[in-house]
């Protein structure tokens, strides 16, 4: 993955509803979910969901599969793993990120 693709993927996920949709699709596995079911589970209007799915699809993070009258969406696990690999290689020097990096310390103010 190159930096342009990584930025595009991260930008697509940098919005609450889109991140929730992506998390739901990852949890649903390779079969994915119908658009109506995604909207119902997350309480998102169909028109809003359509906008978010378009953004995630353009970033390559989701795939759509038409079946009969419905569109089924699934996470693109290859793209997700490529993004995780890019972050690990380029942000953590190829090593697992240290636990200290994931914690925050409280600052003392004078």
Question: Model segments located where?
Answer:
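Amphipathic alpha-helical dimerization/coiled-coil segments
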Residues: 1-5, 26-27, 77-110
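N-terminal helix-turn-helix DNA-binding core of bacterial DNA-binding proteins
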Residues: 4-5, 9-45, 67-79
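Histidine-centered divalent metal-coordination motifs
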Residues: 18, 51-52
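Alpha-helical residues within the helix-turn-helix
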Residues: 40, 57-58
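Short coil turns linking two alpha-helices in DNA-binding domains
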Residues: 45-46, 52
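Divalent metal-coordination and catalytic microenvironments
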Residues: 49, 56, 73
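Conserved catalytic-core motifs of GNAT/GCN5-like acyltransferases
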Residues: 65-67, 97
